[in-house]
């Protein structure tokens, strides 16, 4: 059997076979792994949130038991998810001066805010759908007159950032905090 040394015809033939026969299934498998990982991350964040709720419970009960005495001091405790600084973190990486769903300083910010407002942070599926929608908006131009035109994520990045860094940010959920 001949070795497929880099730069040889056999090497490039093997590369073409991989592209034709295997790449799409590898891509589908990688996307499935990514989706499962983000769902697991959401569950782990939910566990942290539930821990906060458990820790707040005795204090909340105390406040409820002494609400008459504390009426001059309105205290409310609850644990929930919030978007933490997502606009700054996202647009630190995205160039709003190039074609894409987030093109335009005000328009891009408004589009991201509208997407965030649709999310019910109490529901894991809603958070997962947000992540998928954000990815979709990077791949397809969702502005009204662009009819979902395909966009390259790399061209939407600011200098110094990679697609991997952007996806680590999006799928890492660092912007959702309990």
Language model features: what each stretch is:
Residues 1-177:
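Extended, charged coiled-coil "arm/hinge" scaffolds of SMC/Rad50-like chromosome-maintenance ATPases
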């Amino acid at each position: 059997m001949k070795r497929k040394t880099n730069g040889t015809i056999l090497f490039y033939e093997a590369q073409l076979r991989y592209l034709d026969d295997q790449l799409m299934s590898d891509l589908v498998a990688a996307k499935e792994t990514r989706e499962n990982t983000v769902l697991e991350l959401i569950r782990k964040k939910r566990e942290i949130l539930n821990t906060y709720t458990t820790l707040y419970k005795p204090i909340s009960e105390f406040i409820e038991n002494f609400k008459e005495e504390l009426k001059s001091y309105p205290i409310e405790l609850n644990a929930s998810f919030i978007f933490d600084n997502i606009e700054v973190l996202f647009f630190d990486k995205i160039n709003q001066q190039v074609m894409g769903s987030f093109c335009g300083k005000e328009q891009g910010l408004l589009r991201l805010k509208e997407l965030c407002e649709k999310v019910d942070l109490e529901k894991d599926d809603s958070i997962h759908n947000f992540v998928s929608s954000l990815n979709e908006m990077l791949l397809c131009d969702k502005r009204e007159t662009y009819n979902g035109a395909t966009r390259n994520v790399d061209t939407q990045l600011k200098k110094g950032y990679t697609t991997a860094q952007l996806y680590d940010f999006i799928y890492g959920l660092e912007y959702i905090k309990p």
